[in-house]
Amino acid sequence: MLPRGAMLGRLPLVAQRLGARGVAAEGVPGLQCSAKTNVGKLAGALSARLREGAKTTLDSVGPAATYTAIKSIMVAEDYCSQEAQGKVLAVRPEMVKLDPRTAPSGRETQTVAFRLHVALADPLPELDQELTYMSADTNPGLAARLLVRVVEDKGVVPLACMGDKSCGIALRAIMITEEFLGRNNKLGTKALAFHAKKDTFQQGSEERVRILFQCGLVPGSLYK
């Protein structure tokens, strides 16, 4: 068993289980995020939908766009903090196939995107736990095996990410963890989600910033 504080980097491959988990229901409105999307404007649109009680999703393609989406979610939480009454934004990641695009040559291309389901939820407990560090080289399947054990034992698990690629790996690991929990009959009517926040830490003489994902089970009804 790997220690919880260990860096999960450059690990041997396990079965590559990750794939599209289904296409979102037709007619459900969603927000789009690219690498060049203005974080503040997207956060404003997201917080407006949350105030209205609407089911909210963000679609992003590629690590840079997904990183921008996560930053927008953190800013949106600040925007709606007064109305939230102590609640936080809990995010459930999913992978979906977007509508095919037709190139000028007539060839259709299929794109897979992250779809981040965002909802107001009660804060997840923060226990005295070591961080699990996610890197760009982390194997998400192997990481998920560790996360399953921690979630089953403690109920929550904190992940630390630095950069867009490590955040994308963390999202994949969270999705696979949810699948494993379902197979172990530990999910029930709940979903595995995360709350994202910035964390400043000291590394030698340098101050650095990372993103922490506090992962845990929330009511699945939040996203239905």
Spans of model-derived segments:
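C-terminal edge-of-domain segments
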Residues: 82-129, 184-224
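Conserved mixed alpha/beta catalytic, RNA-binding, or beta-rich assembly cores of soluble enzyme
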Residues: 29-55, 60-78, 113, 121-179
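N-terminal mitochondrial targeting presequence
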Residues: 1-26
